[in-house]
Amino acid sequence: FLKEGQRYYHRDNNNESYWYNFDIESQHFMDAKELFVHANEIIIKSLDTFKEELENVLNEDEKSLIHFKYHNDESKKSIVNMIVEMPAVIQINSIWHGFDDTLASIIQAHISNHMINGTSALNLIGYKRTHPLEDKYLFTMSFNPRHNLGSADMDEKTRTSALVQELSQACNELTGIFGEIIKSGMGL
């Protein structure tokens, strides 16, 4: 308890602890430091792949694994669902680990904690896995009514473009954060 005592005094704006001590014990041919760096590299690669797939949403010639669903009901006009269906893929020279709860949680937490404010396009973001045996995630986002994208008469293409831009920005920021984590893990 005393060893972990320091983390109880480090809280974020939501009163959640953000100070943790992790001990990585390698059961692998890589040592603990190499495993830590490799895990962060996997997250960066996954964020980059997700960002590339987001860009395919705007390209009508490409078939995208991400779809946006808008509601026609007047009371739900400001709500949009994003369905992400990106399963793991193993090829000869590369492995895509798939879009998973780790990636969804990282994106949701970053947008909620760092990108949503009184003037931002989004007012709310949350996600859930549709079924434990499916690689399908449903993000629910709400537009800020004080933002111009929150108006009921804004077209879907403009909203989709703005959402892709917001999500790409989140991926870029997270890539930078994980890059810094790798540098600190390598002692640079």
Map each language-model feature to its residues.
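Protein-protein interaction/assembly regions in multi-subunit complexes
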Residues: 1-188
